């Protein structure tokens, strides 16, 4: 990236708040190992439990609100409190055939503002997959289990706080379901720390266990987040935008280029590499814009703007993941963004309004991604 000088300091505006990133809960991560606190929260009459079935949250469709349950509504499914026992005691009971619904401590609502008293108004997620009776009760009371992708596409009007809570809960529940058994030795894992850590039952039950997880911190013992870059690449004169069309996209839909970061790679390097591999376009400047949690299953979208080198040309002879890649003018993008649906399909279709991809495209179209200009 040599030969590039910034004439003036970039003043990136505050990016709009992203869907899935608006939870108002105080996660209280420092209390996740406090069994006494979690046990009191579990039984407290003000605690809310958010039910999930097959990773889908329960929604009161008429109100666009999440279904919440109280302890009396779930108590019959808990033969014992998961927080009144040590991890070893729970492993012993599970080894004898007992089981419990998976719980994830999500945080405190802090309804009256920041506080040091978190004894009330706590929130858990509860996985009720397989508990048909409770699922039916929720449906009988106006609830329905909704695929989170449907919520994302604006079919429902979920609040920012609820969307953030759903993203957190779904990601953790998905992680727990994928790692029911220890990758190190194959024995059953036991959720602990409010559902945010997994401990191998063999380690808990056998002092002479040879499980690799006993020998240090492993990436399967804690939830992971996979970083992805998603970028709007601008032409050198910053008047055109590079978008691609994936084979799986509906006809006419163009979106930002994107891809996972690889080990030993910086954010900027990933933007340059992914753009080159998918389009052949060389990028000489990368600017971070915003991020969006993406709970499918546990990704974090890192949105960036990139500036293409002068006279950069599209060459699609490397990664053929995309069906088409092209530069669009600001006028073309604006025309499609402001298209009246009554006139039929827009010339260019874009990702849903709640996506960070759409926010990036709009930031370019309305020229509000920077308050100054760059000279090459």
From Swiss-Prot:
Cellular component GO terms, alphabetical: cytosol; nucleus; peroxisome
UniProt-listed CDD domains: NUDIX_NADH_pyrophosphatase_Nudt13 (cd03429)
Keywords: Hydrolase, Magnesium, Metal-binding, NAD, Zinc
First-tier enzyme category under EC: hydrolase
Domain Nudix hydrolase positions: 223-351
EC number: 3.6.1.-, 3.6.1.22
Residues reported in the UniProt entry to bind Mg(2+) 2: 274
Keyword Hydrolase attributed: yes
Gene Ontology biological-process annotations: NAD catabolic process; NADH metabolic process; NADP catabolic process
Reaction equations catalysed: a 5'-end NAD(+)-phospho-ribonucleoside in mRNA + H2O = a 5'-end phospho-adenosine-phospho-ribonucleoside in mRNA + beta-nicotinamide D-ribonucleotide + 2 H(+); NAD(+) + H2O = beta-nicotinamide D-ribonucleotide + AMP + 2 H(+); NADH + H2O = reduced beta-nicotinamide D-ribonucleotide + AMP + 2 H(+)
Subunit annotation: Homodimer.
Family matches, as PANTHER family: NAD-CAPPED RNA HYDROLASE NUDT12 (PTHR42904:SF6), NUDIX HYDROLASE, NUDC SUBFAMILY (PTHR42904)
Entry protein name: NAD-capped RNA hydrolase
Annotated organism of origin: Schizosaccharomyces pombe (strain 972 / ATCC 24843) (Fission yeast)
